Structures are given as C-alpha cells and as structure tokens.
Amino acid sequence: MKSIGLNLSGREYKILIGSDLLAETADLLKQAIPCDRVVVITNIDINRLYGKKLKKHLESKGIGSLFLELPEGEIHKSLDMASHIYPQLINHFAERNTPILALGGGVIGDLSGFVAATYQRGVPLVHLPTSLLSQVDSSIGGKVAVNHGGIKNIVGSFYQPRLVISDISCLKTLPEKEFACGMAEIIKSAAIGSSELFKQLETNTPAIKDRSPEIMEDIISQTAAIKAGIVCQDETDRGIRNILNFGHTLGHALESTSSFSQSHGAAVAIGMCFASRLSVKLGLCENETVLRLEKLIADFGLPTRPQDIDPEKIIDAMHHDKKVSDGRIRFILLKRPGEPLIAENILRADVISILEEMK
C-alpha cells in the first residue's frame, strides 16, 4: 500500500492506494474518524459488485451502515438528486459526525461530496473511488459540485475529504471504456506534470492496458502525487491549480453540448488534442508534441477528434465555463510534456480555426 499525504493550511488527509483495501475500510476509517455508523452513497452497479461485502465488513467491525443506491450517469449529478438524498439523511438521524462514504466513480464522488459539504454545514467525507478516473482525479483535491441548467459542475464548492481509499482491485471489473476514460486523466497529469511519467506511459502501454497490479499501483500513485502537490500549492484554484484543467476547457463544452452523452474522459482526450494543436498554432510547441500526445491517446482507445460539432455552440458553452475570467476563456496550453502554461487572450478566430481543422 502506498500513502500520499495532503497538508492544506493545517488540515491533513491521506490518499491510500493498494490492492484489496475495501476489505480494510473499517480499520483505515477508524484511524481517521472514530465512528460507529456511516452513510454509504453508491450506484446500482457498484452496489451490486461491492455493497454487500462492504456492509458485512463494516458490521463485523462494529460499524452500522445506511446504503443509499442512486441511478447511474452524469445526468443524475444534480440538485434534484441531492434533494432526494437530504431527507433520507434526516430520516435516519445522520448527525454532524456521521461520515458519508462515496463508493463509486466520479459522479458518485462529486454528488456525495456536495451533499457532505452542505448537509448540516458539513459532515465527514471519505472517498472510496472504484473507477480509474476517480482514483487519479476526482477523489483528490476537494472539488465537489453538481450540474445545473446543462452546465457542467456549475454549482459547487471546495470540501476536502478526511480520507481517500483507492482499491486498485476494483479496476478488474471496470469496463474497457471507463478504463480508457481514466487513462485520459493520467495522460493529462503526465502532460502537465511529468515528462518521465509521459515516457513511461508510452513505453508501458501494453502492460497498462493489461492492468498489471504493480504497474497500475505505480502510475496511479504518481498521478495522484502530481495532483496532490498542485492542490497543496493552490487549494481553491486561483493560480497554478488551473493547469489541471488541461483539456477541460473544450472537454466540458463537449460534454455540455452533448447533454452529457459524451463521456468525461473522451471529452478531455479531445480537449487535450485541441489545446496542443492550438499551442502549435501560437508557436508555443513543436508539432512532435501533438503527434506524441495524439498517438498516446489513440493507443488507449480514446478519440482525438470531435464528431458533429458546431464551433459557435462550442464557444458559447466555453463562455459558461467556471474557468472564464472577466469574460475571457482560459486555456491551458503546452510547450512540451511537463511544461504547461495558462493563456487567456486567445483569439476567437484561432479557436474556430482549430475546431474546423479537427472536424
């Protein structure tokens, strides 16, 4: 098991990464939060895979549990769904010291975090991420949010968990499409934070696709450490944390304009290709960087170009993004793997030009 610590203005928590950690949840939980009951928020599929075993494990350690099973999908990450959860917490007498355990992927983590942040002005939150994307990205850093009015993550806050337990054994049951989506965030982290990790992904693609436990624990730990290091420098996304949005400016617009039928990982993959091409157009990086990035993305079964888009609608969606500042769309561009930069004064014509080029 590997442990990564985050220290945020005196608040500390750990990200634990290893095999079969769900079977150790109670002991790990008690070390962080003394408790005798918890609320577990999950979805139908994850509950079927892990819910019964986790509930039995918690009970064997003297921890009672209420499991709330939600529908699957990004469309349910909403204020309506949060409003569905609050009465159940009230009816079961969940208190301010009753931890909420988010058992699932990014949607469950974001929604559970939002509920934990707002119920009784904040209750303890523990992430049990079961998807690759949530293990390397969404469970780390304290961003909690729901979608509203067709806009991705427009209602939310920063609310740090008390503990993250990433059981890489859960990746065995992850569908190929979801595994690829998680790889998009790993590629993103390598592109902005580590040329060495980028090379490692290029070199070890077959073993990673085979989900070798040793390699997965290593690259998940490296990716989590990259994000943790950035978050510790800029918890509330006012400066350097912006670089974690590489690929996300276009990515979120693609998700929103598709009514969230476009997966997050696929949208980010396309967004990274767009941002790297824009970087070349602006003379910031060599075309070789684009070729390496697009090949790596394609090698993991992710798209490199958008399908059936209207550039004007995409730009309008970008203007609703929370990364907009003073009316200017903020892009994270790339000089080379490991060297990102933040840019705001990008001409609309250049954005449209690259979108047309990629159609």
Swiss-Prot record:
Residues at which Zn(2+) binds: E185, H248, H264
Cofactor(s) demanded: Co(2+); Zn(2+); NAD(+)
Pathway: Metabolic intermediate biosynthesis; chorismate biosynthesis; chorismate from D-erythrose 4-phosphate and phosphoenolpyruvate: step 2/7
SUPFAM superfamilies: Dehydroquinate synthase-like
Compartments (UniProt record): Cytoplasm
GO BP terms, alphabetized: amino acid biosynthetic process; aromatic amino acid family biosynthetic process; chorismate biosynthetic process
Transmembrane segments: none
EC number: 4.2.3.4
Positions contributing to NAD(+) binding: 72-77, 106-110, 130-131, 143, 152, 170-173
This protein's UniProt keywords: Amino-acid biosynthesis, Aromatic amino acid biosynthesis, Cobalt, Cytoplasm, Lyase, Metal-binding, NAD, Nucleotide-binding, Zinc
Cofactor detail note: Binds 1 divalent metal cation per subunit. Can use either Co(2+) or Zn(2+).
Enzyme class: lyase
GO cellular component, one term: cytoplasm
First-listed, main subcellular location of the protein, grouped into a coarse class: cytoplasm
Domain of life: Bacteria
Name of one Pfam family that matches: DHQS_C
GO molecular function per UniProt: 3-dehydroquinate synthase activity; metal ion binding; nucleotide binding
UniProt cross-references to HAMAP family, sorted A to Z: DHQ_synthase
Family statement: Belongs to the sugar phosphate cyclases superfamily. Dehydroquinate synthase family.
Function: Catalyzes the conversion of 3-deoxy-D-arabino-heptulosonate 7-phosphate (DAHP) to dehydroquinate (DHQ).
Name of this protein: 3-dehydroquinate synthase
